[in-house]
From Swiss-Prot:
Gene name for this UniProt entry: eIF4G
Record's keyword terms, sorted: Initiation factor, Protein biosynthesis, RNA-binding, Translation regulation
Protein name: Eukaryotic translation initiation factor 4G
GO terms, biological process: regulation of translation
Protein task: Component of the protein complex eIF4F, which is involved in the recognition of the mRNA cap, ATP-dependent unwinding of 5'-terminal secondary structure and recruitment of mRNA to the ribosome.
Subunit structure, as described in the record: EIF4F is a multi-subunit complex, the composition of which varies with external and internal environmental conditions. It is composed of at least EIF4A, EIF4E and EIF4G. Interacts directly with eIF4E. In higher plants two isoforms of EIF4F have been identified, named isoform EIF4F and isoform EIF(iso)4F. Isoform EIF4F has subunits p220 and p26, whereas isoform EIF(iso)4F has subunits p82 and p28.
Native source species: Cucumis melo
Amino acid sequence: MSFNQSRSDKNEGYTQYRKSGRSNNFNPQRGSSGTHSKPGGAGGSAPTSSIASNRSFKKTNNAQGGQSRGGLPAVNSTDSSNAPNPRGVQNGAVAKPPEGPHSQRSTRDVPKAPTSQSAPLSSDGPAPTTPAKGTGDQPKEFAFQFGSISPGFMNGMQLPVRTSSAPPNLDEQKRDQARHESFRPVPPMPIPLAPKPQTQRKDTGAGDQPNVGQQLQQKDTGIINQPNTGDAHTVQKAKKDMQASPNHPTNQTQKPTTPMSGISMTMPYHPPQVPVPFGGPNQQMQSQGLTPTSLHMSIPVPLQIGSSPQVQQPMFVPGLHPHPMQPQGIIHQGQGLGFATQIGSQLPPQLSNLGMNVTSQYPQQQGGKFGGPRKSAVRITDPKTHEELIFDNKQSNAYADTGTSGPRPPYNLPSQTQPLPYAPSHAMNYYPNSYNPNPLYFASPSSLPLPSGQSAPNSQPHRFNYPVSQGSQNVPYIDMHVKKPSGGPMHGISDPPNREHTRDTHTFQPPAPSGTVHVTIKMPTDPTGGKGSDTLPNKLPTTEEGKSQKPSSPSVDLIPPSQRAVDTTSESSLHDSKLGREPSGIKSSPVISKQFTDGPPMVSLESQDSSSVQSSLTASSEESELAVAHSEVRRENLLGSDLHKDHQKKTSKKGYAQSLQHQISGQASSALGVPCQVQDTTSPLVSEAVEAKSLIIPAVVGGKSVSVSAVTSDPLESKDAGLVSVAHSSSPENPGLGNVKNLDLISDDNQDTSSKEKNSEPVVLKIEEQGQATFSEPPVDLKNSENVLDHDVSKSVEVAEKTERNLIVSSATVSNEVLTSETAQRAVDEPVSCNAEADVSASVSSSSTVPENSQDDKLVVDSSGRYDNMSSNEVLKNVVKSDQPSEPALNPGLSEGKNDGEVLDTVGTCANSSQGVSGTKDKSVVETSRVKGTTGKAKKRLKAILQMADAAGTTSDLYNAYKRPEEKKETVAHSESIERTESRSSSVDTEQESNEAIKEDAGALSKAEPDDWEDAADIATPDLESANGDGVGTSMLDSGDRTGDMAKKYSRDFLLKFAEQFLDLPHNFEVTSDIESLMSTHTNVSHHHDRDPYPSPGRVDRPSSGGSRLDRRGSNLVDDDRWSKLPGPFAPGQDPRLDLAYGATAGFRPGQGPNFGVLRNPRAQAPVQYAGGILAGPMQSMGPQGGLQRNNSDADRWQRATNFQKGLIPSPLTPLQTMHKAKKKYEVGKVSDEEETKQRQLKAILNKLTPQNFEKLFEQVKAVNIDNGRTLTGVISQIFDKALMEPTFCEMYANFCFHLAGELPDLSEDNEKITFKRLLLNKCQEEFERGEREQEEANKVEEEGEVKQSEEEREEKRIKARRRMLGNIRLIGELYKKKMLTERIMHECIKKLLGEYQNPDEEDVEALCKLMSTIGEMIDHPRAKDYMDSYFEIMTMLSNNMKLSSRVRFMLKDAIDLRKNKWQQRRKVEGPKKIEEVHRDAAQERQAQTGRFGRGPSINSSARRGGPPMDYGPRGSVVSSPGNQMGGFRAFLHQPRGYGGNQDARQDERQSYEARTLSVTSQRAGGDESITLGPQGGLARGMSIRGPQPSSAAPADMSPLPGDLRSAPIASLNGYSSASERATLTSKEDLISRHMPERFAGPTSMDHISSPERYSNYGNKDLRHSGRSFDRSRPISPATPPGPALTPSLPSEKVLSEDRLQQLSLTAIKEFYSARDEKEVALCIKELNSPAFHPTMISLWVTDVFERTNLERDLLAKLVVNLSRPNNGTLNQAHLVKGFEAVLGNLEDSVNDAPRAPEYLGQILGKVITESMVSLREVADLICQGGEVPGNLLQSGLGADVLGNILKTIKTEKGEGFLTDLRTNSNLRLETFLPPDPVKSRVLEEFI
């Protein structure tokens, strides 16, 4: 019985047989009572029941809610060996003794038929007695899983053979089923000895098992061959070691029908079951073994993913435990899987406990109903009669799983979470009422879903969350009345819902030994390829996938009455239902259910264009019909859950006829979607086929009868190859259908690799079109080929299996040509992917039709539903042919033999079948991937598709960006339906019909309240795809109108599916600009999936967001990359489920939470961040809370934005529009004229010129070839332009000219010598005169006829002229200082400016003052004294001229005073500064302000009064007083917390001020003693003065620093800790690094903060006085006990060591560079009180300055001179001589560090000599004796360089005359200083 059944139905069996342990394990194996030893299920038992967790693959139903838990052990499964050992089997395949198949309780397996067992069901051969539990001798049983049924025996009951004409009584069946429910530990009825085929499969334990059941069996088998991902739970023997995505097992857990996600399972995901090493070979186990404990549990919530809003999911309050898990009661978030397996399904509503604000999309599920009643019934209209066939909701409930209009799981990122291991195979229904009386729970207010996990808010990502059929939460069509699990197919489960639903159809059990199973499948002709109609006797409201998924295209399953008639065996009430229109060219996908019995089974596959698909498996002797009913309703599920289901199905072995039935139309995305897989009982490992059995499957495809023959090896043997030949003759009823000439399926054993492609070989489906069908036109009679059995294998592509064979369905286009896709699965990277289990996606056939004319086109659908082998041209043909609607008919109903490699996925293709691919479009592909445990090609492909979609499609605008990628389209045009872009309609379907269909579909959809405006819009316009308004996925109805209008529109997602298949463009393809832009945009994302098979967690491959994703996540295979993207606590390769201890619920990915795509379900707000799925309390956001992440093509892009600010949604990247390209495009810097190129280069250099990069840029100028007068003139003009407009930088530009003049050679043009100086002089004169002209023009009155200027314009001109003139004057003065201009020129300029002093011009006077201040000192020499006197007399007179403005008069007085003051500026004229100087000045200014703030009367008062000197050490320093310590440390401690750069600058400032304020206010010294906040001074020193100072102050302050301060960025206590400051304040400027240790207390304590990198901020403060003040305090504080801790406390008498003196002296000079306070330096030197150290100090200073800037060298020279002046007395000549002697002695070493040391030393000595501090003769003698060895300097040439630079400096400073006099007086012979050859000294040679 399906777990979804209402409890009332199940109560009998359930209560009776329910295992107590099951409650704890969501999916404890029901079948094996032993399995769940304890209620908690957490114990090892859980592992035992890895399958037993009732997530057994059968549990496929779990998600669906219908699967028998018992399925866990393969009964008597040889593989499972019936090992009761809990973990004996991978994932504890089934430790418990296999119970009868019934015990396993294939939820859906049990037909609804009366309990009476109808022997007829069994095929000839022994009655399908299911072996007793685990009787090894008996034929292997199949563990029942969704859709897995012992063919003749259901849960111990044999179903009477039903004629197709008489629909089964579903209610009756349900009741019976309930009685026999597999819940019972013991089969309700004696189990027939004959193994049910399923049972056998179980035994087979291998690929043969039904989808889920098979996997369960595998578990039983203990073989690691569990379904790849466990989605399919296909037991792949070959893959035993394979790690199927562990997630899938969880999927199988699917028991939680729906919202298991939210449930925090009692964590006991039995670790054993989950071999954590998901990456381990047995990852599959994980999925299976996880049973209850699967971390999947953290299924975010049953969020509806698809557009199917129809079924509202219950809201869950994250914090609420909706209902206690079965026995366990409510599971607390941290708890182990508390829910009984069964509960899992129920949990759906609260599954996740993840509170989701999501309005429950599914109304509360009534007993047994998971996913809630379906809102809408699927209406199938007969194309001809237009009569509606509505399936009863109850029935739909039974299959509710199949039809999920709810959001597709694929979008639920949670899919990764999806696998709720605990979901019982039974629908969670049991508890829904009791525990979830009201599905509505209010989610936590947090509206932001964890961004990293993208889970549809309403869908539970876990595949198992929903009843099997339910699939992901696509529960849109769940009929509450139905007792059976409803809800979208679990993602992890492949069509399990359908399988479960198969109970509706009678599953006959062919004799295990052998027999021909005749399966008659009537394919619903669902135009959209949705599950057109289930064969349910009652009318199922099957919502076309398109509808449920996307209202965009109403999908209607049309079954021509004739076909329906043909479908005599069909149980479905479809016959009863009236089909309004005849689907012309409807493709019905035959579903082949291949079950291997001992004998070759014969499967007759009839696909008729009927809404119902029936499959009957008959023993060779007897033919039973198994009506495959699947709710078409689930179309949406197909899309969303399709993927899940597909995966599940595939994984579960689509072999389940049930699943076939259910998903044939919907989930399989095609009739095949419900493929029955024949699983060979034998291990797939057997390479050879001992016996080949022929399987003949007659199928009617699109009204044509097709017989498929498959040669299968003996069940006991691995099926080496299955050859299926399909001969198909078109029936007159479906003239439009092409004939399937032959379908050749060859699957070889994995070992037989000779002809196999490693990844997979496509099964070739050859369709021969006997006649042309004109779909858009009235159907043309096609040649009818009577059932021709064609064994021709047009192409046998061997499917290479990694462990499983991927069955690739190649869909032949109508042409005879067989479409082969060698590469169809090349994209399948995952081993499991090979197991593409006839993914629904693969089953794309549903809505795709082969273009009529695309005879040559090849379409291959791999299990992933991909078109691999099609050439790009082919794709273009199929996709783009606008002239003819093309719909490749692919029947994705592929069921792969699990591990056996037995692939009997028959893709029935009807050329005309317009069945919409259910979700195959996008989802199919993804689904398949999902199914593959590891990673699905499809998934990768999906990833690529999504990425490509990002590049090409919806991103064009925000609206599209927020939308899910064409979900609607998905329904409409599924991946496989690409060619079918416009489904053809052979019959003339009027637009009216199409509208009617739309209305019907819309009506069904409308029944479910649209979740948002998008849905509403979709419903309003269901067909968005076709140009003319017809939905692409619409049934052929739509295409009827379109015959004339061939313009086709393809959804982006649809087209993108070909992205990876077709990488090469056609030869003649023209890449237009718009295409090129898209291509370029796509490059960044196209191959992401290659390295990240599992798309980023936030971006689940849309189609399969179900359990498979969960499995993947659970597995270690998960890419580290993907996990690393998650900010959450989960380690990159770690399964979050393992982290439950951390409070994360199992299966809950860090960011996972409902993710509502932007407006997808605006009402569904993800509650708080789900911690681990259950509301563990708002955890720290594991991921950016920013943009809601969606599971759509944009998801990955959004997912990557993990660092967005909260609340910000990054705008998706949209493809850039191609820029208009001019014929002759402009290229930057490209100039034809060489001269212009040079000028541009020079201008660029000048624009970047600054004092800092002067030297570097000057080298670039030299690199420019200035080789003619024109270029040279241009350079000078540019320099003048820059200088005149930037007067502040005149000095720099003059220096530039000076260097340039020295570097440029003399040029000659026309025999005329051209020199730079000459051109420069001309330019100066020109500019000077030009300035006068401009002034005159600005002042003159306009003459008549001239344009009159306004006063503003005139003033503007005047200002501009004045600025230029002043700049010119200043530049001239600077050039003169550089000796570029002569003194005579200067005098001429002055005279010109004085001009008419009687009537002075203010601008001229101002310029004169500026010039005098610039060059006055140089021209005021004795020889020019007369001139200067006359100038200043005039200036004095002008200064008293009241006609001048006061500003100008004061300027004149300043110039006069300047001359009187010997040209010494009262204040330094500020010129350009380097950045570090700017920082220093800013620091000083700030320090001065804080000093005023914290100190007493005045800054220097204490020092002058003898009080403790101020300390300018870093304010708030760590060594401040104890009171200050806390405040000071606050800043330090804050920063590490902010991780450095994150800290707000204002915070730093605030903290620093807090520290300062605290220290100042808390302990303010009394009196007028100033208190410095520095480390040594201020409070600390004040304390020492007033009383004893704790000697440990400094160490104590330092010790508490957290960690090593050098590494942690610390907020500057003075608030000045910008990065630039830290960068610029290098060790050179950071005096603290060297002197602070002494000041503080010991080098050791200070070491923590001394280094500049650590405390660059120390440089911020003005440390000018620190060294001095520290030391000066010594004499003041003799009372302080001497100690090493504090320098200030040292007694004054103590003589400092040499090292100490060096450190202090360096500290003092560094302070001087910053503060430029010579007095402070003098005080520091006096405090050293060591005159003998002065020469060494000078030596240290000079050597140190070699590595400093020119400015600092100038400062040092002036300092030395001033300190040596007699009036100062700090230094004397002897000190200087000895000091320079030491420098010269070490010059050879200094050159290594500072190559230009000789130049710098010469500059310093030149200035000292100029000031007469030392004579040139003395210096020359020092040079001669200099070097480590006396005389070495001369030998090396360094001495000559030093002397040459001395002379050069003297000449620059004092002029050539002064130098000549000096040389004469010194009596030097410069030749003696020249180095021996070959060494040269150019500098000195200039003076010789």
